[in-house]
Amino acid sequence: MAFPETGPGSEPRWYHGDLIAENLLVRGGRLAAVLDFGGLAVGDPTVDLIVAWEVLDPASRDVFRRAVGVDETSWLRGRAWALSLALGTFPYYWSTMPDRCASRLAVVRSVLADAAATQ
């Protein structure tokens, strides 16, 4: 799976950079707060689409994608970011945070399943 090229809407913008389940507070089934702005930066905003694979099941991911209105190229870049960031977890946390590694392995599986479904 190649990293998709940039396209419309890929101009550098502010992004959170770490929209994972541990950084999202939900109350009453709705997003109440976002935590941990240590990764805040200016760059490819599609990095924040990782939330689709981090916390959503396939059906919810489809709803999210339609609600956000993201184009195909941006969606593919977001998916590539999700894979890249999930894989980067293993060397650092394999021995110390097995639960985090397990959740990132689930992200890798989701990304690969989505990629296979769109082949």
Listing of model-derived features with the role each one plays in the protein:
Residues 20, 38:
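Adenine-nucleotide cofactor-binding loop residues
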Residues 1-17, 104, 108, 115-119:
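An alpha-helical support segment within catalytic cores of ATP-dependent transferases
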Residues 39-42, 50-119:
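Helix-rich C-terminal or lid/interface subdomains of diverse kinases
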Residues 14, 33-36:
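Pre-DFG segment of protein kinase catalytic domains
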